[in-house]
């Protein structure tokens, strides 16, 4: 089984990114052929600073490796180094409807936030995302709940292409974590945790100091009542139960049993302690890795070579199926 996912090199990684994506990436190394991409091209679809983007690619690579990605057990590369992605994106536009792209929630939300220019790249984002995955004929795409509609679109694109030009692509499945699919802001649990749209005190960053993490959980908003139980009217406590369940690798019901009869304050302190201890090794290892950009660049370049070897074969099949470029010559067999 081939597993593929991409991660944005924008902003500091928070607990939602870590539980919803990075933990899945690490586990994927034991489940199949894992291919992970730092999507710098996607990051250019909104306003950005070029020098900052380059630095954040290294930040992201370091945090992924610190979390447990092993370049010897997976392919880790920078999207912009594998040009097959962009050519495949263009070819896939022939089987993608404008209406589908206009309906994407991410396009509508981000286009409102753009002050000067809503780029065509922002509209085309899901097509490039489809190219990212389909180039490797991936079977599974680990994503958060907010990316479900993009995976559904890439599935539709793959099916449409196969029907029009012949069986070429694998139709991928999404893999959304059962626990922690949407980590909420600790101060405003009605919305998801976010580096850009969330509150500073409600956003736990992976590289936060342990004391800062504990402090944020102690100050987290709770709900009416006194029982450590999930419920639709208890978004704050539900969020923290699901966070601790993800940290422990257990079902939320197990957390509820462990804290039966305890006060909210004790529960919040316990969650803060466990999250801080869980992230501490990642923070320490990140510090060791981030100081050697040459080593990180070497890992990304080696990963790009491996990725290109796969994607180029897929692109050749796509071009042949679509009639783009010269016809393939038959294999020359020895007399």
Predicted regions and their residues:
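Internal, conserved structured core segments that host functional sites
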Residues: 109-161, 165, 185
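Short helix-capping/linker segments at secondary-structure and domain boundaries
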Residues: 98-102, 135-142, 245-255, 283
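Conserved nucleotide- and phosphate/pyrophosphate-binding catalytic cores
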Residues: 149, 155-335
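A generic secondary-structure signal for well-formed alpha-helical elements
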Residues: 61, 68, 96-100, 138, ...
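N-terminal Rossmann-like or analogous alpha/beta NTP/dinucleotide-binding catalytic cores
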Residues: 2-131, 274-277, 287
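Short, histidine-centered active-site or binding-site loop motifs used for metal coordination
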Residues: 7-9, 40-42, 139-140, 197, ...
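Short catalytic-loop micro-motif centered on adjacent basic/acidic residues
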Residues: 75-78, 142, 225
């Amino acid at each position: 089984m081939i597993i593929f996912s991409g991660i944005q090199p924008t902003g500091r990684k928070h607990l939602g990114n870590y539980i919803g994506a990075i933990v899945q990436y690490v586990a994927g190394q034991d489940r199949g052929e894992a291919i992970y991409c730092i999507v710098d091209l996607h990051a250019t679809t909104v306003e950005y600073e070029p020098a900052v983007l380059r630095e954040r690619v290294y930040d992201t690579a370091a945090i992924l490796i610190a979390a447990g990605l092993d370049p010897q057990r997976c392919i880790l590369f920078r999207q912009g180094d594998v040009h097959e992605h962009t050519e495949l994106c263009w070819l896939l536009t022939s089987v993608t409807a404008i209406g589908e792209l206009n309906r994407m929630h991410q396009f509508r939300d981000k286009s409102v936030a753009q002050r000067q220019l809503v780029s065509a790249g922002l509209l085309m984002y899901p097509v490039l995302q489809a190219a990212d995955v389909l180039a490797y004929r991936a079977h599974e795409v680990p994503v958060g709940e907010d990316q479900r509609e993009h995976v559904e679109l890439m599935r539709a694109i793959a099916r449409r292409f196969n029907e029009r030009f012949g069986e070429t692509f694998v139709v991928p499945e999404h893999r959304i974590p059962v626990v922690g699919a949407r980590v909420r802001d600790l101060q405003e649990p009605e919305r998801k945790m976010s580096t850009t749209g969330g509150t500073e005190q409600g956003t736990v960053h992976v590289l936060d100091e342990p004391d800062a993490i504990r402090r944020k959980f102690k100050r987290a908003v709770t709900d009416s009542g006194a029982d450590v139980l999930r419920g639709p009217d208890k978004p704050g406590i539900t969020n923290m139960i699901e966070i601790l369940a993800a940290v422990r690798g257990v079902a939320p019901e197990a957390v509820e049993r462990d804290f039966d009869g305890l006060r909210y304050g004790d529960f919040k302190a316990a969650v803060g302690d466990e999250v801080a201890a869980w992230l501490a090794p990642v923070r320490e290892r990140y510090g060791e890795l981030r100081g050697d950009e040459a080593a990180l660049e070497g890992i990304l370049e080696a990963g790009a070579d491996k990725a290109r070897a796969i994607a180029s074969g897929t692109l050749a099949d796509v071009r042949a199926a679509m009639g783009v470029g010269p016809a393939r010559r038959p294999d020359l067999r020895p007399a």
